[in-house]
């Protein structure tokens, strides 16, 4: 199911990231009391009253070198293009500013719900000052102190009230996959080559894909697929120079919708920090993952090239040890015929269910190979395990004391389960829980 998107917009230093962290329930953006410091995680999942939504802190997408008004205009552009609900954060301490009026004019022209959050209302006396914000023409202002958590519930109530109606679940028989990666790694060319037709504009200039495009196709065995392209960021025909920053958000939305993610790397340029960041999002989301090295035809090779590349990938993506690697060329179509079958196998692994009796046989065999650890004379006891979810496969291991389950032993059990049941290309989760 596609999660609705909520974008937090506002000029620097009004508390966007603090509100983001409050809603997310954790400190995942870098927050300092200096303008423009949000440079870390900008995307997470929020939940309120049993409604889940994707949350974007647009401050994390600002170009620090861009002029001030251009930065906030970019934020508004992002919100208008991508968000279902916009939270416009202003400062109650500073009152209405020219920048606030500028953004409000842009947001007013959208047909999207805008929630006006007046932050830094840290004491009751300041509540009278929020009425000045009615002049922005965006409806009732909500007093908020995101530092103290006061008023956050009212903001969340308003968000949920304005979220679009939940869509019915998509056809579970269709495998949905996306191609993610830096601009100009060849995602569009890969799509064209897989489909055998020019469905997407492919150009050597980074960021030229005009919008995200879903394409459906059927393989020779009758399996249906939906392919999601994520390249580019469009607003009135203009592609921003900071394409990588904007493509992060587009990739996040595609990852949400995908069963399997193809992490595309440009063989000509090698692995970059951006690649690891995006791959980390896919891993944390529990998606099936294939590492696709594109433009393989363009580099010189010897008998050691493949093994050197594989070692480099494993070193840089240690958290993706389960992900298969394939070297392809969109230009020559080298190995592209293997991708649909790989995607299908990984989707099957994502949905695989293991009977409890069989699972516990593997757990007991694992304990026989490597006995459970002890801590201060007390030994970990494993009573039984059961699978509780798929996509990704998730198992609960019931024990005498959760604290005795060291991370290393949990990883050992995970590897034993993965090997026994051939979980290809998917993370699997093991959770230790005390038996009651």
Curated annotation (Swiss-Prot):
UniProt-annotated binding residues for GTP 1 = 10-17, 57-61, 119-122
The entry marks the following residues as binding GTP 2, namely: 181-188, 229-233, 294-297
Instruction: State one molecular function term (GO).
Output: GTP binding
- The KH-like domain covers 352-436
Q: Which UniProt keywords apply?
A: GTP-binding, Nucleotide-binding, Repeat, Ribosome biogenesis
Query: Which BP terms does GO give this entry?
Result: ribosome biogenesis
The source's domain of life comes to Bacteria
Q: What Pfam families does the entry give?
A: KH_dom-like (PF14714), MMR_HSR1 (PF01926)
CDD domains, sorted: EngA1, EngA2
Domain EngA-type G residue range list: 4-167, 175-351
Q: How does it assemble?
A: Associates with the 50S ribosomal subunit.
Q: Which PANTHER family match?
A: GTPASE DER (PTHR43834:SF6)
Member of which family?
Belongs to the TRAFAC class TrmE-Era-EngA-EngB-Septin-like GTPase superfamily. EngA (Der) GTPase family.
State what this protein does.
GTPase that plays an essential role in the late steps of ribosome biogenesis.
Database matches in HAMAP family: GTPase_Der
- Name this polypeptide is given: GTPase Der
